[in-house]
């Protein structure tokens, strides 16, 4: 309800950052966002990622960058032996890929790792560090989206493996 009412321009890039938990439907792989205090039993309080992507596609902005630092879990009542991978984009996106870019800190069903030296999530720490300039790979004073993605992907993967011996794959 709120997003479409925001007056943007066709030249505006919108950035949305979400941290918390996500639920993966074990029939479809569809991801829903859950409030930090939500429970699997209270699925009515989830918000469909697909719905958010559609709203961003319809918004009057040039591009939207959606950054997600989520711990993912399977939907309630699902078979623990059957794991359906999260589906981050929808087949009927109709131009969405050109206008909505996803940066996902944890692409699999697992807890997103914390990073104690930074006192935040591993993805969030390196996302912020990259935005402050560490991702400026060509040292021209500008952090491009591709540079940020490459930097965050490399750092999160390496630190997760070293810290916990458990890879946290970004997307």
Model-derived regions: residue spans:
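Cysteine endopeptidase catalytic domains of the caspase/legumain-like
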Residues: 1-171
């Amino acid at each position: 309800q709120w997003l479409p009412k925001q007056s943007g321009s066709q030249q505006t890039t919108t950035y949305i950052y979400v941290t918390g938990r996500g639920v993966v439907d074990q029939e479809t792989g569809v991801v829903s966002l859950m409030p930090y205090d939500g429970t699997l039993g209270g699925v009515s309080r989830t918000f469909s990622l697909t719905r958010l992507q559609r709203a961003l596609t319809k918004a009057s902005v040039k591009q939207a960058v959606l950054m997600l630092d989520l711990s993912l879990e399977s939907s309630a009542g699902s078979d623990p032996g059957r794991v359906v991978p999260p589906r981050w984009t929808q087949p009927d996106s109709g131009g969405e890929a050109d206008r909505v870019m996803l940066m996902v800190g944890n692409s699999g069903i697992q807890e997103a790792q914390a990073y104690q030296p930074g006192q935040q999530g591993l993805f969030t720490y390196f996302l912020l560090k990259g935005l402050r300039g560490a991702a400026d790979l060509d040292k021209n004073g500008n952090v491009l989206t591709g540079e940020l993605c490459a930097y965050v992907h490399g750092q999160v993967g390496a630190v997760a493996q070293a810290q916990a011996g458990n890879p946290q794959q970004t997307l």
